[in-house]
């Protein structure tokens, strides 16, 4: 535990009865009571997430957009100042180094939010590639905390609480603001499938903001949401988690994330490999499923088509919305034409549980 990092709000969460787990090298709140109740609170009301473990990287300089268009799969020319876009960072083989959100401050300044488990790796990767470009790469991860407020009532809550900061920001847009004298970024983005904001705050004011939203909550129940509910929320929404649905061994083609890839760009790292994979047409795919049983297949469990080994589970959990286990699985290309067959199973402790492939819960 000596090398495990703690959030700036660690003691705050302790005082709110948080139970902790270790994730991506951080000691994180996994729940504050019932993770199912926390999940449904976000679906029906609103919830607060401390995701200060996420990494922040600033790219700045006259060739910042050229650099990012080379190292990322999406086209940064598609967005204007004040807009955000999802993208992937691939290796030469088309595998995904990380998935991230890019916030365009200006044509020569971009703010990246990257996964905590990859933050250091991403920063070093970008540093090794930036030399030919007239721009700089700065790691701001230690400088910023990140609080997310998500749910159908999140927008009204924050607009009423701090209207000067949260009004008139559209989805996938953000605003650079001075909050209590500190440069902050307020983004209408999220990882739950619900509307809401993600607020990047300097660590000097993140505690003040957390106390403000907590004391202003109209509910007597805790509004703070842990990692367990965050994972079930993203599974229902169909969002990928790096190291599961995507990795350096799983490409955007296989993960069905080509909407985050602009193959029309002149060049970017991984483009040739992705084009070749599409031409070969032998790739497997990541599919969402529901289990026809109460037991939950976990990551690494074998997926069978009849008695044939056909894939593996990448994520598994319980969906409070459909009240059943759901998950994702990588299915080998030879079996994809049979995905509507009723003869699919996932193995749990030697038992074969029937599964059916479907759209993510929130997209049905």
What are these regions (language model features)?
Residues 1-87, 95-97:
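Acidic, proline/glycine-enriched N-terminal capping motif
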Residues 6-10, 21, 27, 130, ...:
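Glycine-rich, acidic
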Residues 47-73, 140-159, 281-291:
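Short glycine-/aliphatic-rich beta-strand segments at the starts of folded cytosolic domains
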Residues 62-63, 115-120, 152-155, 202-207, ...:
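Helix N-cap motif at beta-to-alpha junctions
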Residues 71-72, 124-131, 161-162, 209-217, ...:
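Short amphipathic alpha-helices in soluble, non-transmembrane regions
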Residues 81-85, 119, 167-176, 298-300, ...:
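Glycine-centered loop/turn motifs
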Residues 250-364:
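Glycine-rich, small/acidic residue-mixed loop/short-helix segments
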């Amino acid at each position: 535990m000596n090398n495990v990092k703690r959030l700036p709000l660690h003691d705050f969460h302790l005082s709110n009865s948080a139970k902790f787990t270790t994730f991506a090298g951080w000691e994180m709140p996994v729940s504050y009571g019932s993770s199912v109740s926390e999940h449904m609170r976000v679906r029906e009301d609103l919830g607060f997430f401390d995701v200060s473990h996420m990494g922040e990287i600033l790219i700045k300089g006259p060739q910042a957009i050229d650099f990012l268009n080379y190292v990322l799969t999406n086209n940064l020319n598609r967005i204007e100042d004040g807009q955000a876009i999802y993208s992937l960072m691939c290796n030469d083989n088309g595998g995904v180094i990380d998935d991230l959100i890019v916030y365009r401050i200006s044509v020569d300044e971009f703010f990246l939010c990257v996964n905590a488990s990859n933050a250091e790796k991403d920063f070093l990767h970008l540093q090794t590639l930036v030399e030919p470009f007239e721009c700089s790469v700065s790691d701001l991860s230690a400088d910023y905390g990140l609080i997310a407020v998500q749910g159908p009532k999140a927008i009204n809550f924050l607009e009423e609480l701090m209207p000067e900061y949260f009004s008139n920001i559209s989805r996938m847009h953000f605003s650079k603001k001075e909050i209590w004298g500190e440069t902050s970024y307020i983004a209408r983005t999220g990882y739950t499938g619900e509307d809401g904001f993600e607020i990047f705050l300097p660590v000097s004011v993140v505690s003040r903001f957390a106390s403000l939203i907590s004391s202003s909550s109209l509910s007597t129940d805790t509004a703070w949401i842990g990692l367990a509910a965050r994972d079930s929320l993203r599974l229902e929404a169909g969002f990928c988690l790096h190291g599961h649905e995507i990795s350096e061994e799983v490409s955007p083609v296989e993960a069905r994330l080509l909407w985050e890839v602009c193959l029309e760009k002149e060049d970017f790292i991984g483009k040739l490999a992705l084009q070749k994979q599409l031409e070969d047409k032998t790739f497997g795919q990541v599919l969402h499923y529901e289990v026809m049983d109460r037991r939950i297949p976990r990551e690494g469990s074998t997926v069978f088509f009849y008695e044939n080994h056909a894939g593996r589970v990448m994520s598994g959990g319980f969906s409070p919305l459909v009240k059943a286990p759901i998950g994702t699985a990588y299915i080998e290309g030879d079996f994809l034409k049979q995905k509507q067959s009723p003869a699919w199973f996932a193995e749990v402790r030697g038992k074969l549980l029937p599964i059916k492939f479907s759209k993510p819960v929130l997209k049905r």
